[in-house]
Structure formats: C-alpha cells, structure tokens
A protein has these predicted regions:
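Intrinsic disorder at enzyme termini
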Residues: 257-260, 266-289
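Basic, flexible linker segments flanking DNA-binding modules
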Residues: 1-88, 183, 242-255
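Charged, gly/pro-enriched flexible loop segments at helix/strand junctions
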Residues: 51, 222-249, 276-277
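Non-transmembrane alpha-helical segments in soluble domains
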Residues: 20, 37, 54, 215, ...
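Conserved small/polar residues in nucleotide/adenosyl-binding loops
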Residues: 292-298
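RNase H-like DDE/DDD metal-dependent nuclease/strand-transfer catalytic core used by mobile genetic elements
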Residues: 47-49, 62, 76-109, 113-224
Length: 302
C-alpha cells in the first residue's frame, strides 16, 4: 500500500473510508475522481475534493482498476526496432481483381521496414501458407539473411501462421511476429504499401485482363517503387538507395545545397534549414504510454 501524506485539513479516517466505499460502488467504479465529485455534488453530497479522492484511491491502490471485470490487457505485440536493412520485414497479402467476377489474384508483398524496399513478391491465384513460405525462403536467399538476424512481422491470417510457413521460418532462423486479432493497425508498413500500390494512376479501375497482365503490372510497380519512388518516410530518397546505404550521401548533398542557399540569402530563413539528416532507426508497433499519468490537482482541501 502506498504511503500518502495528507495535509492536516485533509479528510478524516471516516471520510476516507466513505471515499473508498463510494468509489468502489457500482454507480461510480467506472468513473474518475473528477466525475465522481461532480455527480456527488449533483446529488447534494460532498465527501472531499478531487485531490482528496486521488490521494485516498492511490493510498489504497485503486487508481488503475476498480471493476469486477478483468482489467484491460495491452494486446499490442512487442515493439520491433530496426537500425539497419534486413532486421525487420513486414509482409501481407492483398487482393487484385481478376477478369472473372468474384475471383481474385493474391499479391504477396514483403517490405523491409528500415529501407522500405520491396524484397520479394509473387502474384498467385490462391492464398496459401505454401506460397508464403516459398516467398520468404527466396527473399532470404536473395538478401543473404543469416539465421537469427531477421524478424518477420505479419497479421494473424491463416497463411501467416500455417504449419508450412512456421516450419520454414524455424528452419531459416527467422523470428515470426504476429499481430493480435483485436489490434487493427499494427501492420502499418504493409498497409501503407498497398495503399500506394492501389492509388497508382496506372492501377485499373476495374479488373486486370489476366494473370500475366497483372504480374507484369506488379513487376513495373515494384521496379518504380524501389528505384524511382522518393519515399516521404525516409527523407524522400528511394528505397533502393536507403537499402544500399546511399541515402546519407544524398542527404548530405541536399543539406549543403540548403545551407548554401541560406548563406546567399539569409533573410529568407527564419530558423534552421530543412532537416535532411538520415533516419537512424525505425520502429514497428512503438509502445505509447498505456496508462494515464495522474497529476494531483492543486485545489485546496475545504
């Protein structure tokens, strides 16, 4: 139990017991001290100020959860940090319309979250763990991935957790990272990539003419994305440049151009020039503060 010091004008022992009892009651256990005090006042009752409630509840370890139901559990997977290429990959599957109504092609895409390079893809007529396993094995071979160096993140779909896929990852020494079903936004890199793909001007409004045409379109997209697309999340360099470690030199050159422009015409600049420093780390599922930081109110005990 936390040791909380109460001012001399604080609530009496009887009042503290009443605060605990009221706060745990079915009518108030879902509410914050601010809400409890307001509703008690509406009913013509006063037990203490908001700060009194906070101190009493903190003393009794009741600030976090007072319901009978199970406390909320943070379902987000652990944060994954990449400081170099080929440390964390993200992958997913998206649908592409085929000429046959109600039938689809399945595009498997693997992206390095540090460089944003597409490191592997196939376009298939079925969705399966076997296709996924072959994709990951081929990408690992092409990128020269050593055992124990790579984490592969995906959602919780059947191809991602199929026996063939998991056995392949174990054999390759790749650590799987699966999202939780209740978390909708913990594969943002793949989601962003698919949005870029489907908003390309050349992406058909209807269906592709056939599998070969669709594969050729994806091939051109991957080439453009990796080697021509100046990605906003990596300081507008191409994924290939960043994957090969060329981004720092490119960004240094840009910084020099801006500094020279400022030197020639300083009145145009009110502060620093644009930030062209290289991004040194990328995080997937960064942990935000999952608790409410409680600052005790400064209202006096009255």
């Amino acid at each position: 139990m936390a040791l909380i010091r109460f001012p001399a004008r604080g609530p009496s022992e009887e009042e503290r017991r009443a605060i605990v009892e009221v706060s745990n009651s079915s009518a108030y256990r879902d509410l914050s001290p601010w809400q409890i005090v307001a509703q008690l006042a509406d009913s013509g009752r006063y037990l203490g100020s908001e700060s009194s409630f906070y101190r009493v509840l903190k003393q009794n370890d009741l600030l976090s959860h007072r319901q009978k139901s199970k406390a909320h559990v943070d379902n987000r997977p652990r944060a994954l940090l990449a400081r170099n290429p080929n440390e964390v990959w993200s992958w997913d599957i998206t649908y592409m319309n085929s000429p046959l109504r109600g039938a689809y092609y399945f595009l498997y895409l693997v992206e390095d979250i540090f460089s944003r390079l597409i490191v592997g893809w196939p376009l298939e007529e079925v969705e399966s763990a076997e296709h996924a396993a072959r994709l990951i094995e081929r990408a690992c071979q092409e990128q020269g991935i050593a055992k124990g160096n790579l984490t592969l993140h995906s959602d919780n779909g059947a191809p991602m957790k199929g026996a063939t896929m998991l056995a392949t990852l174990e054999r390759l020494g790749v650590a799987p990272s699966l999202s939780h079903p209740s978390v909708s936004d913990d594969n943002p890199y793949s989601e962003s990539l698919f949005k870029t793909l489907k908003y390309r001007p050349s992406y058909p409004d209807g269906a592709f003419g056939g599998l070969d045409q669709a594969r050729e379109w994806v091939r051109h997209f991957v080439q453009w994305y990796n080697t021509e697309h100046h990605h906003s999340a990596i300081r507008f360099v191409t994924p290939q440049s960043r994957h090969l470690g060329l981004d720092k030199a490119i960004l240094d050159k840009r910084r020099a151009v801006y500094e020279n422009a400022k030197r020639l015409n300083p009145l145009r600049w009110s502060g620093q020039t644009r930030n062209w420093s290289a991004i040194t780390e990328v995080c997937l599922n960064p942990k935000t503060v999952s608790y409410t930081h409680l600052t005790l109110p400064t209202t006096p005990y009255v």
